[in-house]
Amino acid sequence: MSTSDDIHNTTATGKCPFHQGGHDQSAGAGTTTRDWWPNQLRVDLLNQHSNRSNPLGEDFDYRKEFSKLDYYGLKKDLKALLTESQPWWPADWGSYAGLFIRMAWHGAGTYRSIDGRGGAGRGQQRFAPLNSWPDNVSLDKARRLLWPIKQKYGQKISWADLFILAGNVALENSGFRTFGFGAGREDVWEPDLDVNWGDEKAWLTHRHPEALAKAPLGATEMGLIYVNPEGPDHSGEPLSAAAAIRATFGNMGMNDEETVALIAGGHTLGKTHGAGPTSNVGPDPEAAPIEEQGLGWASTYGSGVGADAITSGLEVVWTQTPTQWSNYFFENLFKYEWVQTRSPAGAIQFDAVDAPEIIPDPFDPSKKRKPTMLVTDLTLRFDPEFEKISRRFLNDPQAFNEAFARAWFKLTHRDMGPKSRYIGPEVPKEDLIWQDPLPQPIYNPTEQDIIDLKFAIADSGLSVSELVSVAWASASTFRGGDKRGGANGARLALMPQRDWDVNAAAVRALPVLEKIQKESGKASLADIIVLAGVVGVEKAASAAGLSIHVPFAPGRVDARQDQTDIEMFELLEPIADGFRNYRARLDVSTTESLLIDKAQQLTLTAPEMTALVGGMRVLGANFDSSKNGVFTDRVGVLSNDFFVNLLDMRYEWKATDESKELFEGRDRETGEVKYTASRADLVFGSNSVLRAVAEVYASSDAHEKFVKDFVAAWVKVMNLDRFDLL
């Protein structure tokens, strides 16, 4: 006979309690650690894009597959696709040119020069948040239109390359001559987690241009690619948009001329869509029902497509030939009187009040309309500086064509790194300053040359700390986002890097290495700087009782000052480098978060970061030669002392002041200060994930493993920009 308790005890009747319904019981559901501790250190950012998420496997070689591609056959198929209007998403004027240009633009336009993240180089428009970005409404249709072509050519063309190539072909098919195309963008298989899109919780939250100038954000509102086309915060005022336009395009590394060319060129073809109220538009792809199969924004207004399409809510056609390249954008901009009005969806735009009806309807050849412009288009006429450039382009269409071709190429290739990464038959021969060009190699050191150089470096009088510091300073500028920086080029010896505060100690070794380079004439300074690190690490390992060979691949070259854009390289100066215990500003995040940020830019895993920090500390590689984090009495010896002493419970740690940036480690019995540390040191004992790794390296049997792991991570950083070794 059952008791009253049995009535509520499903196990008493042999039923599994987890099959009885109620709350979500799926893996990953429920309250997470980030819900409980929202400020938890994002160590997970170092585990992105592993081979476990890659269906192609770690042996897949995209460059090799691309070499098998019928490139011009692909372009022919893309050209045909442009005019193959599909009933489920009819083409405006029978052409998808404007749609594909917007797709490419919005893929590339997420790039931010200040941190190198974003951009089109990884095909991120396939994933959230970008696949459901408010500014990307209807681009799900563009990507779906491309699927038959991607399906046909398979892995010979990445989605990332296909998106940009489709934009190029759209321009070419419209009568425009592009600057060229470089392939080489490899797909990833999950969203980037490291891109900081902002801290706003609501879409289209306004940001002030002054705030944009201080932050690595590329848009004036959360969910936009650039600026609100209705003006800042829907102001409807063209002049008020000028500062926002400069801030957002400037964050991409674009100057005023490039900005004007991109806006005008992008708005020479196609149209915006605002046939009816945006309240008719359904959820974005991420929120859409499963039966929508990855599409979103289904509209209930009329047919929902074609003449009834709603995208931005604006209903603008700029030129008389929206499927053919022209200079009509500038002609219309300056020829007519513009009056503010509203689209059928209620969005603010401008009509050419004194113009005849010269704009063709996208679906009814018998209809015409007046030219229309966005608020931000008129900024190019009414802002004094933009107006000068716009009038020059009005009077010199060829100058406009040249400027747009170059700016479009820059926009779509800005995050690809040096030109050596480009592949394909349409790579331009010209070197461009924003590509951080390098000269051709002039040295080819033999194995004996390298041995002789290592002896010269070892006998130079430079300490292990100096050797390691100069190599790290040179290589650690690399950014995995846009593939800029790194040791190749020896730009540590050039402006502006030579004058960075973080490099003050490191560059003191440069004259010695420059002398060795000149006297030997066997290798570039870039190679000798990296070789100095090799010598330092090998000496430190030997002092620890281990004979270690640090791999070294010669072939680096030395850049000239005229090949170095000082303003753009200033963006590579770190606000913090936890590997060297450096921090310039205290108003940007926490020291430990900035360490993760730096490690992620260097494409390091959590164990690699941990090994490098522990090794750099015992080698005395702090930027200012301080003792913070140097938990050893054997500086210059590659030991695991950092981890052993950090985890030693004989010491207790207390902050030295209210900032809690620096700490003293005191002996619990005597109260004597034994060590000092920064947050970038103590995080390896504080954070549970990093402590787990540190415990491995602190173990009594871990010394040799630690040294080998340090060397592997060190070589990885030294070679991050050696794309010729891939």
UniProtKB/Swiss-Prot annotation:
Keyword flag Disulfide bond: no
Catalyzed reactions per annotation: H2O2 + AH2 = A + 2 H2O; 2 H2O2 = O2 + 2 H2O
Single Gene Ontology MF annotation: catalase activity
Record cross-link Tryptophyl-tyrosyl-methioninium (Trp-Tyr) (with M-252), residues: 105-226
PROSITE patterns in UniProt: PEROXIDASE_1, PEROXIDASE_2, PEROXIDASE_4
Post-translational modification: Formation of the three residue Trp-Tyr-Met cross-link is important for the catalase, but not the peroxidase activity of the enzyme.
Needed co-factor(s): heme b
Start and end residues of each stretch annotated as Disordered: 1-33
Residues at the catalytic site: 106
Family: Belongs to the peroxidase family. Peroxidase/catalase subfamily.
Quaternary structure annotation from Swiss-Prot or TrEMBL: Homodimer or homotetramer.
Protein name: Catalase-peroxidase
Gene: katG
